[in-house]
Amino acid sequence: SAQDKLKLAVGQRGNWDTSVSEVGQRAGIFKKHGLELEIVYTQGAGETQQAAISGGVDIGVAAGIMGVLSAYAKGAPVRVIGAETTGASDLYWYVKADSPIKSLKDTGGKTLAYSTNGSSTHGIVTAFMKQYGLSAKPTATGGPPGTLTQVMSGQIDIGWAAPPFGLDQLDQKQIRILASGNDAAAF
């Protein structure tokens, strides 16, 4: 029988929470139900939302609820069809292990990473700024691999990631976690 095709935009390839589509495709789960997925990876929820809103894809996965609700409130033709996570405990912000930055309150004038404009990480960084009265410089850095490179090379002071990304660097004491997404009261 012919498979129905769905084109998905999925943010942050390799994160645990964004692997469901790819794992399901490889395991034949979607095929068993008459579906074939075409998966397009983005650098974050902002790009995922843009792809879905423009009609470039059928579904945006891990699109960031705060950004989606904001887009909906502005009249974008979006609908939430399922929750991926509750809260933002899967996201974390980190520094190089030898950084003098010990907490978010030490980030004055420092660069504070988020993935893309309109993403959950952007919303959380914005919430950090307001909640803690920070004077950091929010900076879009894309996905976790590029962000880590920027942190380790000194281009960015505070990076962001989601497991499993960065766990090796954490175990090897190359990086140190400063905050979780749940440290933003709005999330």
Place the predicted regions along the sequence by residue.
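Short, well-ordered beta-strand elements
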Residues: 3-17, 35-41, 109-113, 137-139
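Flexible hinge/capping segments at coil-to-helix
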Residues: 96-111
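Ligand-binding "clamshell"
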Residues: 3-4, 70-81, 168-183
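Short, polar/charged alpha-helical segment
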Residues: 14-41, 70-74, 123-130, 169
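Extracytoplasmic "Venus flytrap"
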Residues: 6-26, 43-45, 64-65, 117-120
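Pocket-lining segment of extracytoplasmic ligand-binding domains
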Residues: 145-187
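Short helix-initiation/N-cap motifs at beta->coil->alpha
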Residues: 39-50, 63-66, 137-155, 162-164
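Hydrophobic residues within well-ordered alpha-helices
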Residues: 51-53, 71, 107, 150-152
